[in-house]
Amino acid sequence: MTQFNIPVTMSSSLSIILVILVSLRTALSELCNPQDKQALLQIKKDLGNPTTLSSWLPTTDCCNRTWLGVLCDTDTQTYRVNNLDLSGHNLPKPYPIPSSLANLPYLNFLYIGGINNLVGPIPPAIAKLTQLHYLYITHTNVSGAIPDFLSQIKTLVTLDFSYNALSGTLPPSISSLPNLVGITFDGNRISGAIPDSYGSFSKLFTSMTISRNRLTGKIPPTFANLNLAFVDLSRNMLQGDASVLFGSDKNTQKIHLAKNSLDFDLEKVGLSKNLNGLDLRNNRIYGTLPQGLTQLKFLHSLNVSFNNLCGEIPQGGNLQRFDVSAYANNKCLCGSPLPACT
């Protein structure tokens, strides 16, 4: 039988061609946009190549769900990276938020959280993410002020900057965002007054959490225009009247104003029938408890302790289900579950 001996040089050439063909086939079958992949690899580098991002490999497809925290748009089959979760990474040393995030122009959702070694301000590059709906930067050491340039991202629905090292004052400009539904800025070092413009958020806006900061001054009268389902301004240094947050014509479910220096007549406020949580402890609130509290069938959380309230606790509804601690240390509040009035 005749045997054919392929020369070594030809064999090597065939091997090289085979490798090229395999690589070409892989490249052609890859769904990940090459610009998105390059941006992700740069983000990884900018964060010091943490071991938790070891799945981000240049030889694999970033849209095959093996890249930790990366999702691509499969609905429209554009396969652009539209969802990025950068949470819980152990950075080898302090790094800022990568400006290379701006090179992911189709991002809809960005979560950056639980990274102690993430420092510095929120970079202006974020403003280039013009399709961003949900922005979360939480539980980091990111510092500086909440930037005005966020108002350029008209698509924003949710802003959550909770538990960072942010300081400065609240940016008035974000109230112009037409699609914003809620802000969560609790657990920072934000100071100064709440801007009057925060009473002019769109009708879509229903949630405001700015607790555990250093806010001063009064709650703007413009807040009467808001219809908030949830508001938490607790643990600040706010003063004056908070009655603008209440109203029988509103859909308010929770109001948390504890540990401020608020001073208003509680008896005169209107109550939303949907109210299920009310925390007013440690203020200077006076008057009597409104009779309307007995009509709130969803009320399951109440604390009005450490105020200047007087009179008898109304009987009925859920009011007697709360223990003494919910009513304690007022000026002259009495009746069940407190001692009887005399």
From Swiss-Prot:
- Signal sequence span per UniProt? 1-29
* This protein's UniProt keywords: Cell wall, Disulfide bond, Glycoprotein, Leucine-rich repeat, Membrane, Plant defense, Repeat, Secreted, Signal
Q: How does it sit in the membrane?
A: Peripheral membrane protein
One Gene Ontology cellular component: membrane
Q: Which positions form S-S bridges?
A: C32-C62, C63-C72, C310-C332, C334-C341
What InterPro entries does the entry give? Leu-rich_rpt, LRR_dom_sf, LRR_N_plant-typ, PGIP
Q: Which Pfam families match?
A: LRR_1, LRRNT_2
Q: Where are the LRR repeats?
A: 82-107, 108-132, 133-156, 157-180, 181-205, 206-228, 229-252, 253-275, 276-299, 300-319
Q: Where in the cell is it found?
A: Secreted, Cell wall; Membrane
Q: Which GO terms describe its biological process?
A: defense response
Please indicate if the UniProt record lists ATP-binding as a keyword: no
Name the PANTHER family on file: POLYGALACTURONASE INHIBITOR, POLYGALACTURONASE INHIBITOR 1
- What family does this belong to? Belongs to the polygalacturonase-inhibiting protein family.
Put simply, this protein is called Polygalacturonase inhibitor 3
Q: Which organism is it from?
A: Phaseolus vulgaris
Upper lineage is: Eukaryota, Viridiplantae, Streptophyta, Embryophyta, Tracheophyta
Corresponding gene?
Answer: PGIP3
